[in-house]
């Protein structure tokens, strides 16, 4: 997974499915933190 962040209600990059875990687990990007996942646009 690539890193992403939310800004202005949009996720960047918004064309891929990615997530950001809590900083304490920054090495693990397995998308179990659903609320921080950026979903691919339909």
From Swiss-Prot:
Keyword Nucleotide-binding in annotation: no
Principal subcellular localization: secreted
Tissue-specific expression: Expressed by the venom gland.
Disulfide cross-links: 4-37, 11-31, 19-38
GO MF, one annotated term: potassium channel regulator activity
Protein family according to the UniProt entry: Belongs to the crotamine-myotoxin family.
Assembly notes: Monomer.
Protein name (Swiss-Prot/TrEMBL): Crotamine-IV-3
Species the sequence originates in: Crotalus durissus cumanensis (South American rattlesnake)
